[in-house]
Amino acid sequence: MTQVDLVVVGKFLFKEKIIDGSIGIEDDKIAKFSLRELKGDKKIKVEKGKIILPGLIDVHVHLRDFNESYKETIASGTKAAIHGGITTVFDMPNTKPPIMDEKTLKLRELIFKKKSYSDYALGFLIAGNEPAKADFYKIFMGASTGGIYSKNFEEDYKKAPDIVSVHAEEYELINRYPERPPIVEVVAIKKALQASKKMKKPLHICHVSTKDGLKEILKANIPWVSFEVTPHHLFLTRRDYERSKLLKVYPPLRDEEDRRYLWENLKSIPIIASDHAPHTLEDKEAGAAGLPGLETEVALLLDAVNKGMITIWDIVAKMSINPARIFKIKNKGWEEGKDADLIVVDMKKEWTIKAENFYTKANWTPYEGWKVKGKVIMTILRGEVVMEDDEIIGKPRGERIVKEGNAQGNLGSSQEH
């Protein structure tokens, strides 16, 4: 091919294998994967021992802003995203005020256009209201942060014109069991699965945390249903509550048996997402539920690769390829013609997680002091370096995702590529 705008040279992951070569970038898109060194106007040579991966997609992020800008802003949260190797975030709509009408949705988009350092998808909350056109829809089956939930899940689910991300905790059981034991999640998952099977509508179940909940999803095996797990449910358990009262989260941290079952079935889990939910330390001490995670999720997973718990392909499948396919994102993925979103990881870098080095306003992390091996050292968004060696580069240049159309039909296997 003729000369391109930018060539990134080094080892990169391609079809489950790490190969030597180069990636040609033209007009913000991946123009060519090559086994040889392509010619370009500019060149980035990735040092030996480091690997080029696709920019990652986090389908579950709470960026606060609006009346909770003291907790997080779109600017601070998307800086945290690109610092952690996340190039596209899905913005959860249970904000203050909540995104439940077209006017608020448009205001949200205006702020993103001006302030976002990463690309983004806009969510819309349904709880008895009529949906406006968004990139995805969110339904809470029980109260969480913000307190708004659906009183009639089937009716609200039926209204949604595109894929629904559901917080599966049954509201009637929450009232009876405020500590939210596994049954609260399992009953809600069963209810959501039954509705999806009946309506044949796409559904994404957020933060599956229990052995029995995951069993229900796998047993149902509904082609248009996807789901996610979070790093905190993979790496923490109820025993961690003993070391910190700040770890309150919905759904709660579970028993070791649940955590182990998630790991044992990781190949069947299509998506890993952070559920980044920042609060100030004061709010956490007062009982707010939610954990920050944008700047630790990839680090924890790279460390797991080094420990032989997962493969680097698992990360790419569950945080790039599958999210782009399941949510029908036309311009994202690890293919020629898609946006040139790349990250460079140093698999040998040993470091200690410290909240003081993060961009999120949360100012704390559940993993403070953890020693990990593997780090994101560069983030490229649509052909531009936006983060290198922990420093954010340039001004906000985030753009809204481009959808292929409504996310529907067979979502395919969890490891499709």
Curated annotation (Swiss-Prot):
Keyword Zinc tagged: yes
Pathway: Pyrimidine metabolism; UMP biosynthesis via de novo pathway; (S)-dihydroorotate from bicarbonate: step 3/3
Similarity field: Belongs to the metallo-dependent hydrolases superfamily. DHOase family. Class I DHOase subfamily.
Cited Gene3D superfamilies: Metal-dependent hydrolases (3.20.20.140)
Function text: Catalyzes the reversible cyclization of carbamoyl aspartate to dihydroorotate.
Residues bearing PTM N6-carboxylysine: 138
Residue stretches spanning the membrane: none
Entry protein name: Dihydroorotase
Highest classification ranks of the organism: Archaea, Methanobacteriati, Methanobacteriota, Thermococci, Thermococcales
GO MF terms, alphabetically ordered: allantoinase activity; dihydroorotase activity; zinc ion binding
Active-site residues annotated for this sequence: 275
Keywords of this entry: Hydrolase, Metal-binding, Pyrimidine biosynthesis, Zinc
Catalyzed reaction equations: (S)-dihydroorotate + H2O = N-carbamoyl-L-aspartate + H(+)
Requisite cofactors: Zn(2+)
GO-annotated cellular components: cytoplasm
Binding site residues for substrate: 62-64, 94, 279, 289-290
Alphabetical list of InterPro entries matching this protein: Amidohydro-rel, DHOase, DHOase/Allantoinase_Hydrolase, Dihydroorotase_CS, Metal-dep_hydrolase_composite, Metal_Hydrolase
Family annotation (PANTHER family): ALLANTOINASE (PTHR43668:SF2)
Organism: Pyrococcus horikoshii (strain ATCC 700860 / DSM 12428 / JCM 9974 / NBRC 100139 / OT-3)
EC number: 3.5.2.3
